[in-house]
Amino acid sequence: NKSAKTIKEELSYINEQALFADGFDEALVGIDQSDYVAVYDTDKCIDILMQKIGMNQEDATEYFDFNILGSYMGEYTPRFIKIYE
């Protein structure tokens, strides 16, 4: 797996206007090649909120849905995906 640093460097080279979700580097999983934006794992984002901020799962999910998933910062807003293994 590529590190968040490598993904950020690669994406910034391809699309210098790409935006990243602050504090969620551990959840950065790739690049959407159709729009060249950052792609994050939703479950990992929620885990980060639970671990680093101390929220329970319900609060972390609600916070993520409203404040992160629901925010639109323009054309290069990151994408969030649910990964099923």
How would you describe each model-predicted region?
Residues N1-E85:
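C-terminal alpha-helical interaction appendages
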